[in-house]
Amino acid sequence: MTDLSHLARPGAEIAVRVTPRASRNAVILDGEAIRVTVTTVPEDGKANAAVVKLLAKALGVAKSRLVLVRGATARDKLFRID
C-alpha cells in the first residue's frame, strides 16, 4: 500500500484517477498523479465506497474525513480532507 500520509492535512484536495473492475485493489503514486484501482463494479456507488476505503487507509485518515467534491460518476475524482 502506498503511503500518502504526507498529503493528509485538513482542507487538502486530492485528485485521483479511478480504474474500476481491476484485477486488484491498489493505490498507486505515478509521479504527481494518484491512481486507485478497485475490483468492484461502478454500480450504486460500490466503486466509490471502495475508493474511499483505500484512499483513507493510504492517507491514514478516517473514511468520514474524506469528502467527494467532484466526479461521483466519473473516473477522475476530487476528494477533500475535512
Curated annotation (Swiss-Prot):
Give the record's GO CC terms: cytoplasm
**SMART domains in the cross-refs:** DUF167 (SM01152)
What InterPro entries does the record tag this protein with? DUF167 (IPR003746), YggU-like_sf (IPR036591)
Output the Pfam families linked to this UniProt entry.
DUF167
HAMAP family assigned to the protein according to its UniProt record, in alphabetical order: UPF0235
**Entry similarity comment:** Belongs to the UPF0235 family.
Q: Know the name of this protein? A: UPF0235 protein Pden_2174
- From what organism does this protein derive? Paracoccus denitrificans (strain Pd 1222)
